C-alpha cells in the first residue's frame, strides 16, 4: 500500500490535468440527470457505488 501511495503523488499533475478536461462532461451529465426526475434516488445510490469503483480503477493506472 505504501508503494502505491508514493506512485500516486508522482503522477498527480497528470491526473489533475485530465480531471479538469472531464469536468465539462460531468457537468453535462449532471444536467441531464436533473432533467430526469423519475427514479432519481435509486439511481443516485447506484451511481455512487459505480463512481467509487471507477475512481479506484483510474488510480491503479
Swiss-Prot record:
Q: Could you cite one Gene Ontology molecular function of this protein?
A: DNA binding
Keywords, ordered alphabetically? Chromosome, Developmental protein, Differentiation, DNA condensation, DNA-binding, Nucleosome core, Nucleus, Spermatogenesis
Q: Which InterPro entries match?
A: Protamine_P1 (IPR000221)
Q: What are the GO BP annotations of this UniProt entry?
A: chromosome condensation; sperm DNA condensation
Give the record's GO CC terms: nucleosome; nucleus
Where does the record place the region Disordered?
A: 1-61
Tissue expression notes: Testis.
Organism domain of life: Eukaryota
Would I find DNA-binding among this entry's keywords? yes
Q: Where in the cell is it found?
A: Nucleus; Chromosome
| Role | Protamines substitute for histones in the chromatin of sperm during the haploid phase of spermatogenesis. They compact sperm DNA into a highly condensed, stable and inactive complex.
The entry sums up its family as follows: Belongs to the protamine P1 family.
Q: What is this protein called?
A: Sperm protamine P1
Lineage at the top is: Eukaryota, Metazoa, Chordata, Craniata, Vertebrata
Amino acid at each position: 500500500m505504501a508503494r502505491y501511495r508514493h506512485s500516486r503523488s508522482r503522477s498527480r499533475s497528470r491526473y489533475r490535468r485530465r480531471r479538469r478536461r472531464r469536468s465539462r462532461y460531468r457537468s453535462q451529465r449532471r444536467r441531464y440527470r436533473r432533467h430526469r426526475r423519475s427514479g432519481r434516488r435509486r439511481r443516485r445510490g447506484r451511481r455512487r457505488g459505480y463512481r467509487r469503483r471507477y475512481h479506484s480503477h483510474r488510480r491503479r493506472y
